[in-house]
Amino acid sequence: MSPSLAIIGFYFGRWPAWIEFFVETCKWNPDIHWFIYTDCGSPENRADNVLIRHISFADYKALARRRTGITADPDNPYKLCDLRPAQGHIHADDIAGYDFFGFGDLDVFYGRIRGIFTDALFNAHDVLSTHPEIVSGHFAVLRNTEELRRAYELMPAFDHWMHKPDYFRVDDREFAHLFEPAGALAHLRTRFVEEYSTILSPRGWHDGTMNYPLRWLWKNGRLTNSADGAREFLYLHVMRWKSLRHAAATPAATEGAWTRLDRIVKFDWRRAGRDGFCISPDGITAAATAGLRDGDF
């Protein structure tokens, strides 16, 4: 039997336009479960493995304070990303019985997770990150142990960081220090390997260039793109298309592309399971548009 995995997510305010497509990509990973804490109601697209936990932003913060002892009361839901090193402890009841837990953003479209994160990979590691130098806050996996659920307690400044009004990268940069050679969790078996799934990242593409594929096809659970033929990818992280929050001084041509669209979603999600769909700077469109050349932008 494959190691079991539960992924923790949260979203407060209003669902992103692509939520139904996010759920569809989760649905095609049926033996992985997502727990999403939200005040947004239930998406139209229902999946047995996507478990919506209805909770207000205020009540979620109160839960975090009660479980961790922190005293911070952030105003912005985005600040909750800094809580991720504590989420295993905060949600210990929901993830009880799973071999692994993880955390994940909702600006991610998944391919076949177990096609890349194999049983052998799970069995040989305690922590799986998809970036080489940080814990990938948008999707990372940890063995479900007391030590890792309470890893935030090994960060003396955790409560101090949570009091900073802006996101402080506790979940990726600061968390990663625990797994460095001199870190408190250096004894654990970690895999920090770039999976090339965050487009427009300054790390560059796997061919050593900054020429990122711009058209991605999701179909029947498989995620491919316009540059790499049949090669499948773990997920696509559209952080740099959906906003300019992380843009460099001179952004790439398609950075923040979705902020300039009248509509991000231009395809009926009810057809996604049957027909697939394309993800690109043009938004979410019919699968047939994935065959166009990147130069068409």
Segments predicted by a language model, with ranges:
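Catalytic core and acceptor-binding pocket of nucleotide-sugar-dependent glycosyltransferases
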Residues: L148-F297
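Short glycine- and hydrophobic/aromatic-rich loop-to-beta-strand nucleating segment
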Residues: H138-E146
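A short, conserved acidic/glycine-rich loop-to-beta-strand motif
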Residues: N123-F139
